[in-house]
Design a protein with these regions (language model features):
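Active-site beta-strand/loop signature of hydrolases that rely on acidic residues for catalysis
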Residues: 41-47, 67-93, 135, 165, ...
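Stable alpha-helical elements in mature extracytoplasmic
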Residues: 63-67, 89-93, 131, 144, ...
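Surface-exposed cleft-lining segments at the edges of enzyme active sites
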Residues: 52-54, 145-155, 181-197
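Active-site-proximal segments of metal-dependent phosphoesterases and phosphodiesterases across multiple
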Residues: 181-205, 226-238
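N-terminal, active-site-proximal structural segment of metallo-dependent hydrolase catalytic domains
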Residues: 2-16, 23-99, 109-117, 124-129, ...
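Structured beta-strand-rich core segments of catalytic domains in phosphoester-bond hydrolases
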Residues: 84-182
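Extracellular/periplasmic catalytic domains that process cell-envelope and extracellular macromolecules
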Residues: 35-38, 72-74, 96-99, 124-128, ...
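Metal-dependent phosphoester-hydrolase catalytic domains
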Residues: 210-220, 227-328
C-alpha cells in the first residue's frame, strides 16, 4: 500500500544473544502434545518489499532474489512473509521459493482470486494490498483471507489483515494464521495504534472461534504483530488473540533493531529497538511441551543503491530480522 507515513517493521534472529522469556509464556498451562502432533518449524519475516512506485531505491528486486537463498529461509515447514507489497518483487520471491515451498497463498488483499473465501473488509479500490503471504512445504487444504475493518494512519490505505491456511502435515491438520497488525505511525492519534491492534487480535480470536477447530489440532498465529515482547501490550495481545506466549525467546534480543540493522538504522535512527515478531500457539489446542521463538541476526553481502547522486550501502535484506519458531 502507499505508505504515506513510515511504518515500523520487525525482524527475527541468528544465534547471538539468548533471551529467556521469563514473562513471555504467561500463566497459560501447556497443552498436552499428543504423540501425533507434528513438530513444526515456522519462519516469519517482514521483508520490506515496499512498492517501487513509491520507494524506487530500496533494492527490492535484489533483496527478493537473495532472501530465498539464505540459510534461515530453508528447512522450514511454513514461511509467513509480511510487507510483500511490491507486486513484481513479491512474485519473484515466491517463484524462487516454490521449489522448497510449493504450496502458497496469494498476497492478502491483492485480489479475491486464488482464495477459498474472503472475509472482513476487503475492498478492490483500496490503493495497496495487505502484504502477507504464506508459503508451505505441506499441501494446503484450505486458504482464506480476512481484511481488518479497523486501521489508522497509513494502514488505512491498505487491505491489511491475515491469511488462514489449513495444512495436511502427514495426514494431520495444522492451522496457521499469518498477519501484519496495525503499525505505529504518526498518522495515528495517541494510543490509537494499540487500540486498533487490540481490535485486530480480537478479530483473529473470533475468526478462529467460529472455525470450531478440534483441541487436538495445532493452531499457530505468526507475523509482525507490532507488539514489543517486553511491553505491557504483550500480555494484552495474548489475551485478545487467546494465545500462549513462547516458552523461550532466543537469538538476537530485537527483531526490529534500529542500532544494528543497517536498513532500520537508516530509516528510523530515532526510534527504539523493539521485539515485534512472534509465532505463537492458540490456547486450548495441541502444542509442544516447549516452544521457542528465535530472532536471527541476519547479515548479507553489501549491496548499494543510488539516489540523487548519493550511494547508500546496506548489509541486511530487510529492516526486520527474521524469526524462526520450533519445538524445544
Amino acid at each position: 500500500m502507499p505508505h504515506f507515513s513510515l511504518r515500523r517493521a520487525q525482524c527475527a534472529a541468528t544465534l547471538v544473544l539468548s533471551l529467556t522469556a521469563a514473562g513471555l509464556a504467561g500463566a497459560s498451562p501447556a497443552s498436552a502434545a499428543g504423540a501425533t502432533t507434528p513438530s513444526m518449524k515456522v519462519l516469519t519475516y517482514n521483508v520490506f518489499l515496499m512498492s517501487k512506485n513509491l520507494y524506487p531505491n530500496w533494492g527490492q528486486d535484489h533483496r527478493a532474489a537473495e532472501i530465498p537463498k539464505t540459510s534461515f529461509f530453508r528447512g522450514n515447514d511454513v514461511v509467513v512473509l509480511e510487507e510483500a507489497f511490491d507486486n513484481s518483487a513479491s512474485d519473484a520471491l515466491k517463484s524462487a521459493a516454490a521449489a522448497a515451498y510449493p504450496y502458497q497463498t496469494p498476497v492478502v488483499g491483492r485480489s479475491r482470486s486464488g482464495w477459498d473465501a474472503t472475509g472482513g473488509s476487503y475492498s478492490a479500490t483500496t490503493p495497496e494490498d495487505g502484504g502477507v503471504t504464506v508459503l508451505s512445504k505441506w499441501p494446503v487444504l484450505r486458504k482464506e483471507q480476512y481484511v481488518y475493518k479497523d486501521a489508522c494512519g497509513s494502514d488505512w490505505w491498505s487491505n491489511k489483515g491475515f491469511a488462514y491456511v489449513v495444512l495436511n502435515v502427514n495426514g494431520t491438520k495444522v492451522h496457521v494464521i499469518g498477519t501484519h497488525a496495525q503499525s505505529t505511525d504518526s498518522g495515528c492519534a495517541a494510543g490509537e495504534a494499540a487500540s486498533m491492534r487490540s481490535r485486530q487480535f480480537k478479530a483473529i480470536d473470533a475468526f478462529l472461534d467460529a472455525k470450531n477447530i478440534p483441541a487436538d489440532e495445532q493452531v499457530l498465529v505468526a507475523g509482525d504483530m507490532n507488539v514489543d515482547s517486553r511491553s505491557p501490550e504483550y500480555a494484552s495481545m495474548l489475551a485478545d488473540a487467546d494465545l500462549v506466549g513462547a516458552d523461550a525467546r532466543t537469538g538476537h534480543p530485537y527483531s526490529f533493531d534500529t542500532l544494528q540493522n543497517s536498513i532500520a538504522l537508516d530509516r528510523y535512527p530515532d526510534d527504539p529497538r523493539e521485539d515485534l515478531d512472534h509465532v505463537l500457539h492458540r490456547t486450548g489446542h495441541a502444542r509442544p511441551a516447549r516452544w521457542t521463538n528465535e530472532v536471527v541476526k541476519e547479515q548479507c553481502a553489501p549491496w548499494t543503491v543510488s539516489s540523487w547522486g548519493t550511494d547508500s550501502t546496506y548489509t541486511n535484506l530487510s529492516d526486520h530480522y527474521p524469526l524462526r519458531a520450533s519445538a524445544g
